[in-house]
């Protein structure tokens, strides 16, 4: 009887310890069939615990916290790329403006230094065919100039080939004109020495008119004050006739020289 009571108490103790304990010890002698009976109450008790209930919420919160910096970083990177694009466009526009200003300044300097080269540059930039092949376009322009005005073409070739002419084109052209005048003057000296001497006197006046306009105008005012002309009007008429005859001879010998005679005649009359 006592053994039966003791066995019942032991079995009761095992049942009570199984319901209250959360972990079954490994050294338990309970059979494997008894263990599944204790698992559902343990899991039910664990699910009812506050820490276990808060764990999914903590996971959601941590995931949202981790996702917020990623979104902020993405927004910051997009903003940074936008700012970089805007600054790059502004820098490109500034560079284009600087290049245009440099090009305009160089064109203005070219226009002051060499008007012919400036006009050629303007024609090259305004013509699409000239942009494609500038060398062929320049050759075509030179051929057209040679056919239209051979004298101007020869002068242009001389200006391009002579470094002195490039520095001072006006003086070089005057020298070339005087060299063209010399043969006509030699013929005039052989035909009419008096007219030749008058022409030699007129040449310095013409040079003075080209070099210094003020001095030329002063000389214009002093020319009428000639005592020989004032005293004898016949002398003045004779001199005028000699000058006109010399002009006619020069126009027959050298038409280019006759084009300059209005300047010389203005200095006399």
From Swiss-Prot:
Extent of the signal sequence: 1-21
Keywords (A to Z) from UniProt: Seed storage protein, Signal, Storage protein
One MF annotation (Gene Ontology) recorded for this entry: nutrient reservoir activity
Pfam family, one: Zein
Source taxon at top rank: Eukaryota
Record bears the keyword Signal: yes
InterPro entries according to UniProt: Seed_Storage_Prolamin, Zein
Statement: the UniProt record of this protein carries the keyword Signal: yes
Role played: Major seed storage prolamin.
Family designation: Belongs to the zein family.
Protein name in UniProt: Kafirin PGK1
């Amino acid at each position: 009887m006592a053994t039966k009571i003791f066995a019942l108490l032991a079995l009761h103790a095992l049942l009570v310890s199984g319901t209250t304990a959360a972990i079954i010890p490994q050294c338990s002698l309970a059979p494997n069939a008894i263990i599944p009976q204790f698992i559902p109450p343990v899991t039910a008790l664990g699910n009812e615990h506050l820490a276990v209930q808060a764990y999914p919420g903590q996971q959601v919160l941590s995931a949202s916290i981790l996702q917020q910096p990623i979104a902020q970083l993405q927004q910051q990177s997009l903003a940074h790329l936008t700012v970089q694009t805007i600054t790059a466009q502004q820098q490109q526009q500034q560079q284009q403006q600087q290049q245009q200003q440099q090009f305009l300044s160089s064109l203005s300097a070219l226009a002051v230094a060499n008007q012919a080269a400036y006009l050629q540059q303007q024609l090259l930039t305004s013509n699409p065919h000239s942009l494609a092949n500038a060398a062929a376009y320049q050759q075509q322009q030179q051929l057209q100039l040679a056919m239209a005005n051979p004298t101007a073409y020869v002068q242009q070739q001389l200006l391009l080939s002579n470094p002195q002419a490039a520095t001072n084109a006006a003086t070089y052209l005057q020298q070339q004109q005087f060299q063209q005048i010399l043969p006509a003057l030699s013929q005039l000296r052989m035909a009419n020495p008096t007219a030749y001497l008058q022409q030699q006197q007129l040449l310095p006046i013409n040079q003075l008119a080209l070099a210094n306009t003020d001095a030329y105008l002063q000389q214009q005012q002093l020319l009428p004050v000639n005592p020989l002309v004032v005293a004898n009007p016949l002398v003045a008429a004779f001199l005028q006739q000699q000058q006109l005859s010399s002009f006619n001879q020069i126009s027959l010998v050298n038409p280019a020289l006759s084009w300059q005679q209005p300047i010389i005649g203005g200095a006399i009359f």
